[in-house]
C-alpha cells in the first residue's frame, strides 16, 4: 500500500481555533520510491489572529500570511483533490495523530468537506513518531540520537534529521519536514528486519488493531511516557470483553502481575486495585496507531525475561479464558 507522508504548519497550537497556512507532502510506494509531492500555502482566514509563537516556529512572514495566491478555502480544495488522487494510502506524519490529523479534520469540517479523508476507507493512518520510538526501543542503534535537557533521548524531528546527516535548514516548513520524515522512515525500514517493519505498520486502523488483540493470546505493547519507551507483555481480556464499553479501546492485563488474586476480587476491590501503580490493566488506544509487537519481543525485557514461558502462558490463558 502506498504511504502518504504530510506535514502542516498552522497559525497556532490549539486545533479548534487555528488554521492551516502551509501543507506539504510526499507520496511513496511500498519500496520507498517517491511517486509524487506537493506544497501549498494559503492566506490566513479574515478576522483570525495568529499566535506569535507559532509564526516564530514556522518562520511565516506577515506577507506570506496575508498575500499568498491561495485563500484558505482554495488551498483546502487543492489538498482534498490531491489526497483523493493519492488514495488508497496510509496517511502519516511526524506526531500527526495528535495535531496534523486533527487540523485536517477540523479545517475540512469548517469548510464543509469530508473531515475523515485521511483515515476512512480506503485509506489508513499511522504516526511516524510512534514508529520511530518503537524502532529505537527495539534497537537503539537504528538511529543516531542525542539527549535532551531532561537527560532523555530526543525524538524531535529536527534533532533526528540533523544527526542522520539530513539537511535541516528548512525545518518547520511543511514539505521540508515531510521529506525528512520520509528519509528517517526509509532509514529505519532499511535497517530493521522486514517482519518488524510489518509489525510496526499493522495498527494503521482501528479495525486492524482490534483484530490483533482479539486473536492473539499475548502481545507486546510498546508505550512511551516520562520520556522513555516501556515494554508491556500483556494478555488481552476475553475476546467478548476486551473492548471498553464506553471508550471503545482495548483492554489487556500486564503479565508481570499474577492474575489469580484479581480474578477473585469483587468489583469494588478491582476499582481500588486499578488505581494503584504500576497499573496491571493496560489500555490499547485502538484508533491512535499503538505499537503492538509479537510476544517474543516483550520476553526479551525485564521483568518478563526472568519469568518462564510456562508461567507467562499460564497467566495469559487464565486472563484470556475468563469471562
State the predicted function of each range.
Residues 1-3, 35, 123, 216, ...:
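Sequence-level motif detector for i,i+2 pairs with an aromatic at +2
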Residues 1-113, 154, 162-164, 263-323:
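Conserved non-catalytic scaffold segment of RNase H-like nuclease domains
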Residues 10-12, 130, 180, 257:
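Short, glycine/acidic-enriched loop or turn micro-motifs at the edges of active sites
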Residues 44-58, 62-66, 123-178:
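Active-site-proximal helix-loop-helix substrate-binding element of RNase H-like nuclease domains
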Residues 85-88, 109-113, 131-141, 166, ...:
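Alpha-helix capping at helix-to-loop junctions
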Residues 90-97, 103, 140-207:
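Acidic, Mg2+-coordinating catalytic module of metal-dependent nucleases/exonucleases
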Residues 114-122:
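Short mixed-charge
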Residues 186-315:
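Acidic two-metal-ion nuclease catalytic site recognized across multiple nuclease folds
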Amino acid at each position: 500500500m502506498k504511504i502518504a507522508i504530510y506535514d502542516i504548519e498552522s497559525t497556532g497550537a490549539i486545533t479548534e481555533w487555528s488554521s492551516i497556512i502551509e501543507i506539504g507532502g510526499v507520496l511513496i510506494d511500498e519500496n520507498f520510491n517517491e511517486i509524487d509531492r506537493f506544497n501549498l500555502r494559503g492566506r490566513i482566514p479574515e478576522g483570525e489572529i495568529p499566535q506569535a509563537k507559532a509564526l516564530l516556529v514556522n518562520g511565516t512572514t506577515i506577507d506570506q500570511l496575508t498575500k499568498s495566491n491561495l485563500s484558505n478555502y482554495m488551498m483546502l480544495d487543492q489538498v482534498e483533490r490531491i489526497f483523493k488522487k493519492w488514495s488508497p494510502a496510509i496517511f502519516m506524519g511526524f506526531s500527526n495523530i495528535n495535531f496534523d490529523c486533527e487540523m485536517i479534520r477540523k479545517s475540512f469540517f469548517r469548510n464543509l468537506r469530508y473531515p475523515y479523508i485521511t483515515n476512512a476507507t480506503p485509506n489508513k493512518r499511522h504516526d511516524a513518531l510512534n514508529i520511530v520510538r518503537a524502532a529505537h526501543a527495539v534497537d537503539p542503534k537504528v538511529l543516531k540520537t542525542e539527549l535532551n535537557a531532561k537527560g532523555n533521548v530526543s525524538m524531535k524531528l529536527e534533532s533526528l534529521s540533523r544527526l542522520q546527516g539530513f539537511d535541516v535548514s528548512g525545518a518547520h516548513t511543511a514539505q521540508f519536514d515531510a521529506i525528512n520524515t520520509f528519509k528517517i522512515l526509509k532509514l529505519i525500514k532499511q535497517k530493521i528486519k522486514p517482519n518488524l517493519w510489518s509489525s510496526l505498520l499493522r495498527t494503521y486502523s482501528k479495525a486492524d488493531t482490534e483484530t490483533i488483540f482479539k486473536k492473539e493470546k499475548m502481545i507486546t505493547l510498546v508505550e512511551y511516557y516520562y520520556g522513555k519507551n516501556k515494554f508491556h507483555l500483556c494478555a488481552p481480556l476475553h475476546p467478548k470483553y476486551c473492548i471498553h464499553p464506553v471508550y471503545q479501546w482495548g483492554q489487556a492485563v500486564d503479565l508481570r502481575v499474577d492474575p489469580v488474586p484479581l480474578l477473585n476480587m469483587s468489583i469494588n476491590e478491582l476499582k481500588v486495585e486499578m488505581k494503584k501503580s504500576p497499573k496491571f490493566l493496560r489500555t490499547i488506544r485502538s484508533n491512535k496507531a499503538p505499537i503492538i509487537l509479537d510476544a517474543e519481543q516483550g520476553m526479551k525485557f525485564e521483568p518478563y525475561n526472568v519469568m518462564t514461558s510456562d508461567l507467562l502462558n499460564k497467566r495469559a490463558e487464565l486472563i484470556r479464558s475468563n469471562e
